[in-house]
Amino acid sequence: GEKVGNNFLDPGWTKYDKCALYVTFDLSGQLKQGGNAIGVMLGNGFFNIPRERYFKLLASYGAPRLLMKIQIEYADGSTQDIVTGTDWKTTESPVTYSSIYGGEDYDATKEQTGWMQPGFDDRTWNKALDTGWKTRLLSQRSAPLTVRDRIPTVRLFKTRKGQWVYDLGQNFSGIIRLSLHSKDTHPVKLYPAELLNPDSTVNQSASGAPFWFGYTPKGKGIESWQPQFTYYGFRYVQVEGAVPAGQPNPDGLPEITEITGLHTCYSAEDVGSFHCSKPLFNQTYELIDWAIRSNMASVLTDCPHREKLGWLEEAHLMQYSVQYRYNLARLYEKTFNDMRSTQAANGMIPTIAPELVEFEGGFKDTPEWGSTFVISPWYIYQWYGDTRPIETYYPDMQRYIDYLSSKADNHIIAYGLGDWFDIGPESPGESQLTSNGVTATAIYYYDVTLMEKMANLLGKPDDARKYQELAARIKQAFNRTFWN
């Protein structure tokens, strides 16, 4: 069997009760005369989050499921469609556990040779079930996640407690590639982490624990494996149940010949770079670039481990600077649809999109976060000259502005998270040094000024006049309330 494409964690995650993405591949290079076969492995992703191990949230739309259509066009112009149904076969795979938050386990002893090839004997497999599950299907137009970099181990050390730790020398989002030699089926666990404890063991306390990659070898010599349905943010990998090759091994454990980090991220086109004569600035740029890439998944996340959620304030706060480095037009196109899918009946935009979990208070509704739905389409127009997001989502933006207006008291909005995590006398969290009314009302004003510009762009003079007048009233109220 031959894998089609190099996509990782496909398709991108969405609010599945509203819509799901489908991905298209060209199979012409794989089809052969005579018998052909296609095999698919399914993981849980955000569709079904298990309770075992670490989880930020619990959400499930049921067991993983597959919808596929293969369209074949013959030389004579005729076509044939092959569609998934109850005549397809299914069985348990060697992936015995997969969680977007908790890790992945793979039991190589459960592999079935040739399962994805013509002529495989599937008589012991079960017929697929028709789940009857329906949602809106959309083509995934944004680029896939792929492996961008391969990161070798730069240091290997043993803790005082006797555990072996591999240092990859770089924090990144991704998975590992494990190569080992084994004479039996002794399971191996690999714990990734960004930090170390004082005793040099890995520390997952700030990144979501426990998380591990588990591998049970076949026990027949050299084997290699990498996870398929999860990822984490890490630099270090602590090993349990194996030893590095060449080290004392009195218990006959599997011997690791190599651990390589695979940096996975959204495969955006590089459009810019930075370099100067001052090393500090170059190092700062590299640090920021790694952080940006490690948080570019099928949504723009705030961290690649503990939450992996699309917190929206980053989408507009970082948009201009990141667009100097990467072409993100298609990723923002998906983000806009995610926001539309999560918009409430009253027009409110939650702080995360897709809204895979409903938070409360400011963590659900904060103007500085929801305003991405107004700000980012304008930035896309400024950057790429593309008016389609504005044309498509203008009515939804109007609903959001109406919602903010309903929350205003004499044109002042004073709720939400505010200047989140500012440095003040108390432990960081909600704004301490700047009242919420300052930032929330300021961004409300900014939203309305952009709505005036977009109304003019779309040839809606009445709307433009309405937003111009509203902006003037907000400005007057802001200065009256906050200007000393």
Predicted regions and their residues:
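Extracellular/oxidizing-compartment recognition motifs
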Residues: 1-305, 313-314, 330-333, 350-357, ...
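Thiamine diphosphate
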Residues: 26, 358-382
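Active-site acid/base region of carbohydrate-active enzymes
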Residues: 85-86, 91, 236, 244-287, ...
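Short helix-capping and inter-helix turn/linker motifs at the boundaries of alpha-helical repeat units
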Residues: 168, 309, 367-368, 442
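Amphipathic alpha-helical segments within well-ordered protein domains
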Residues: 319, 378-381, 449-452, 456
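Start-of-helix signal in alpha-solenoid helical-repeat scaffolds, especially tetratricopeptide repeats
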Residues: 371, 438, 442-445
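Conserved, charged catalytic cores of large soluble enzymes
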Residues: 442-457, 467
